């Protein structure tokens, strides 16, 4: 089945919703994707679409995510000839804000290095730096404390991306320490703060 087009037809500016593109990666915190999407949809004026990595799919059921969800296969199924849409470009044009939650250690390293080998990292590599991009690191404490992690987070901040810091708690593996994704309420509040700064959305 051909995926639904990511870019809706033009609508009057007063009906234009603020478009949030959620990226989800292969951290166990991806378990919270259905809750995160649900809470975002509770915010008046938000429209949500999800881009997932293949590994992230291990942690949630697509049936529990009540919005359009794209993965790597969609990029290739939609493009057959030169005139066909390029999904990662269409998505970066469609979105007003990108939220990567969770951002696992693997994808953090890719983004910091400019690697774009799946749909999500291609969207990020093509991202319009005039638009906000929020990221929520999530990984085991031992991975979080590796010196590379601080360097890579700093690189993302240098790009202009905004970190929603991880928190300290008992992790799924049983360890206690930093590395857990920020609470859903914290993430949604940050999105709302960005939304409040964009009272009028320019029609794209």
Curated annotation (Swiss-Prot):
Enumerate the residues binding substrate: 140
Which UniProt keywords are present, listed alphabetically?
Answer: Coenzyme A biosynthesis, Decarboxylase, Flavoprotein, FMN, Lyase
Report the SUPFAM superfamilies cross-referenced here.
Homo-oligomeric flavin-containing Cys decarboxylases, HFCD
Q: What is its EC number?
A: 4.1.1.36
Task: Please give the Gene3D superfamilies that the UniProt record associates with this protein.
Answer: Flavin prenyltransferase-like (3.40.50.1950)
Its GO biological process annotations read: coenzyme A biosynthetic process
| Cofactor(s) named in the record | FMN
Signal sequence segment: none
Q: Which reaction does it catalyse?
A: N-[(R)-4-phosphopantothenoyl]-L-cysteine + H(+) = (R)-4'-phosphopantetheine + CO2
Q: Which enzyme class, named as a word?
A: lyase
Give the matching InterPro entries.
Flavin_trans-like, Flavoprotein
Report the GO molecular function annotations.
Answer: FMN binding; identical protein binding; phosphopantothenoylcysteine decarboxylase activity
Biological pathway:
Cofactor biosynthesis; coenzyme A biosynthesis; CoA from (R)-pantothenate: step 3/5
Quote the Pfam families the UniProt record gives. Flavoprotein
Active site (catalytic residues): 173
Record-listed FMN binding positions: 53, 104-107
Give the cofactor note text.
Answer: Binds 1 FMN per subunit.
Quaternary structure per UniProt?
Homotrimer.
Into which family does the record put it? Belongs to the HFCD (homooligomeric flavin containing Cys decarboxylase) superfamily.
Q: What does this protein do?
A: Catalyzes the decarboxylation of the cysteine moiety of 4-phosphopantothenoylcysteine to form 4'-phosphopantotheine and this reaction forms part of the biosynthesis of coenzyme A.
What name is this protein filed under? Phosphopantothenoylcysteine decarboxylase
Q: Which organism is it from?
A: Mus musculus (Mouse)
Q: State the taxonomy lineage.
A: Eukaryota, Metazoa, Chordata, Craniata, Vertebrata
């Amino acid at each position: 089945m051909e995926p639904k087009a990511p870019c809706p037809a033009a609508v009057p500016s007063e009906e234009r919703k603020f478009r949030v593109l959620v990226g989800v990666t292969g951290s166990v915190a991806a378990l919270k994707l259905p809750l995160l999407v649900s809470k975002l949809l509770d915010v008046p004026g938000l429209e949500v679409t999800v881009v997932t990595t293949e590994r992230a799919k291990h942690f949630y059921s697509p049936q529990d995510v009540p919005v359009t969800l794209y993965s790597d296969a969609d990029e290739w199924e939609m493009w057959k000839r030169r005139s066909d849409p390029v999904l990662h470009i269409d998505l970066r044009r469609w979105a007003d804000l990108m939220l990567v939650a969770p951002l696992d250690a693997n994808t953090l390293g890719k983004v910091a290095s400019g690697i774009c080998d799946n749909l999500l990292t291609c969207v990020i590599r093509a991202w319009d730096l005039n638009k906000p991009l929020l990221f929520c690191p999530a990984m085991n404490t031992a991975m979080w404390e590796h010196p590379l992690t601080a360097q890579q987070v700093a690189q993302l901040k240098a790009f202009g991306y905004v970190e929603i810091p991880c928190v300290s708690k008992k992790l799924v593996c049983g360890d206690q320490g930093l590395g857990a994704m920020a609470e859903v309420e914290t993430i949604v509040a940050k999105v709302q703060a960005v939304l409040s700064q964009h009272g009028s959305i320019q029609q794209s």
